[in-house]
């Protein structure tokens, strides 16, 4: 089973919004064995060892009230520590492969919950936005955490994703959360509500113009931008080349630009040039919204 790369937040949707795209993927193969326990082998990028996937299985087994013997092989093609949901997609792909192999019917929210709790092994705390998008595909809103309530949309959107080749930031999630403001002015709060409303409305209508309005952010992104390599230049060059909006992908350092199809080539070239002028190597891809790992289950 295959799970797509994801980009969380998208500007104003901090911790509640993520989109699945086909820039990269993680794929998993599972064989059931006798006994109880999970044996995991990784190929490609290893997102923090097998703890993420192993814990995801443990949480799912607890939810189902039974333990299985599982041999899982995960082929992760999503660069790690780049804000692209690598660990979450690996866990989702493995759980989806297990569910198919075991012939089970499982509530998608239970899969997302198990994978999100498993991701705490890599991120330090549960994150449901990335794993929800990897599982369900399209664009996902976390409407509630307790109980976990997910809302999926299926917009047709095109992105340019820039992935700089930089050393991973130690304790990235902790650092990028530590810089967030503890208080915001009331007017900023109201403006942020308007933006995230536009973001969700844009998903519902598959309207890039509304999504672009929602990708503007005055709270989280300004605080994180100084910690994202080439942020200002990438953003400026992408917008000048025709991008509708630009945001940090997850906690970075990758960036994601929303584009019209006709402008994707020009924006991709502009982002490549921006990284090069900053002295950075980067992989820049044109991507579209993708289906999730649970689509056939």
Curated annotation (Swiss-Prot):
GO terms for molecular function: ATP binding; homoserine kinase activity. Its EC number is 2.7.1.39. Keywords: Amino-acid biosynthesis, ATP-binding, Cytoplasm, Kinase, Nucleotide-binding, Threonine biosynthesis, Transferase. GO terms for biological process: threonine biosynthetic process. It catalyses: L-homoserine + ATP = O-phospho-L-homoserine + ADP + H(+). One of its GO terms (cellular component) is cytoplasm. InterPro entries: GHMP_kinase_C_dom, GHMP_kinase_C_sf, GHMP_kinase_N_dom, GHMP_knse_ATP-bd_CS, Homoserine_kinase, Ribosomal_Su5_D2-typ_SF, Ribsml_uS5_D2-typ_fold_subgr. Belongs to the GHMP kinase family. Homoserine kinase subfamily. Catalyzes the ATP-dependent phosphorylation of L-homoserine to L-homoserine phosphate. This is Homoserine kinase. It comes from Pyrobaculum neutrophilum (strain DSM 2338 / JCM 9278 / NBRC 100436 / V24Sta). The lineage of its organism: Archaea, Thermoproteota, Thermoprotei, Thermoproteales, Thermoproteaceae.
